[in-house]
Amino acid sequence: MGSIGMTELLLIFGIIVLLFGAKKLPEIGRGLGEGIRSFKSAISGEEKKEDEKVVTPKEIEAEVIKKEKVKENA
């Protein structure tokens, strides 16, 4: 109970064909695929942003001081 069997899937597919027609099915599938693809890329984009290192102001200040000391010694 609760799982969808092969007969239920065929029935759902038949209803979709009746509602939209056979000519519209490739367009619907293409649109659905593009939507899923863009959703996945948006999610992976957020993960990439989280992986990037966050630089704090203290780290920036320390780097500037380090460069100034190098200039003074040169």
Swiss-Prot record:
Main subcellular location of this protein, as a coarse class: membrane
Keywords linked to the UniProt accession: Cell inner membrane, Cell membrane, Membrane, Protein transport, Translocation, Transmembrane, Transmembrane helix, Transport
InterPro entries: TatA/B/E, TatA/E
Membrane disposition: Single-pass membrane protein
GO biological process terms, semicolon-separated: protein transport by the Tat complex
Annotated transmembrane regions: 1-21
Record has Transport as a keyword: yes
Origin superkingdom: Bacteria
Pfam family, one: TatA_B_E
Single GO MF descriptor: protein transmembrane transporter activity
GO CC term (a single one): TAT protein transport complex
Annotated compartments: Cell inner membrane
Family of the protein in this entry: Belongs to the TatA/E family.
Binding partners and assembly: Forms a complex with TatC.
Job of this protein: Part of the twin-arginine translocation (Tat) system that transports large folded proteins containing a characteristic twin-arginine motif in their signal peptide across membranes. TatA could form the protein-conducting channel of the Tat system.
Protein name: Sec-independent protein translocase protein TatA
Gene from which this protein is expressed: tatA
